[in-house]
Amino acid sequence: MEQAALADNTDIATAIIASGIADEPVTHLVEGAMRRLVSAGVPLDRMQVGFRILHPLFDGMSITWTEAAGVEVSYYEHIDLDGSTYRLSPFHYMLANEVTELRLRIDREATIERFPVLMELKERGFTDYLAMIVSFGGAPMTPESHQGLGTSWSTKHPAGFGATDIAAMRQVLAPLALALRVVIKDQITRNALNTFHGPLVGGRILSGLIKRGAGERLAAALWYSDLRNSTGLADALPVEAFLDLLNVYFDCAAGAVMEEGGQVLDIIGDAILAFFPASGPPASGPGGGQACASALRAASTAQSRLAALKAQGNTRAEAISFGIGIHFGDVVFGNAGTAERLKFGIIGRSVNEVARTADMAKVLKRDVVVSDAVVSRITSAERLALSDLGEHELRGIPSARRLWALASTE
């Protein structure tokens, strides 16, 4: 007996497209589409869609809808294409044989024994299974490709899916895949921008601030750090080992910056330029205390993290030493470059001053050196962690500057 009498699924398809145009969260889009199918009579109890994403931490993402629990989103750190979980899945079979649709009666067919995931569904009371693959761009989808997605549709109904049920799911698949493709492309774009430029710059680029010279003046606590003896380490270590060492350093330093709400603007070789935007008046005013305190906490965390790794016997960490300079001042946050190649960053005298402050960390044999512009903005309790280094000439800076060191890093 047919379970759904859907003469026309245009309304469902239209609703899916409308959700995509309205930029609804992907969870709402999937939830709405599945609920409409169920309301139309399709005995759907579970739908899952999976696809690869471009992200430094995750290989893939899946969205699972069930009648009982609604929508759940999962991320996969690593998709092992040689592992048994993937190789014994219906999608491996489909991609290997260039099959775009696979239907199996879970409650009847012995074939399901080759697919552990279907045996699991059978134990949970499912009776029918339909898998469909959509390729983007015309070429067949591959396991490594971002150009497509896989879907599976399951029911617990004793009679399984009827012909009109399957027709309904097929008809809904194209608009659903199109809407999800927009979401996937948007997420890949955001992930790439956030990874290579940081969320603040990435957000500004997506908002349209891409013209040369576009920018804003703001006050910020500035951070500049660099790895000591980087040339010697690069010469002494194989390339792969040196890259591993750099990543340990970046995890300690840049990781601490981001945890405190700072923005890593640039990684230049082994140097890190970051800033903590201040709310309120410019550097000439009394504000910026919170930004300065965040920068100091990040510096303390970075050095403490490195010390902890050394105590644990981390061989890469044992070779690492880095100095940090922290300053506060006005900068122009915007982009500059050629007409065809622009770069977002911070520009101004304060950027030079924080770099010169970081230079003094090496000269004075300190881990963290802080300018008086920072110290004047923090609380008296926060100043207790600092020791006065007196006034020093900074290369290229007209007048001597009073500098301080984090006492805990001496």
Regions found by a protein language model. Name each.
Residues 163-217:
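Regulatory cytosolic signal-relay segments
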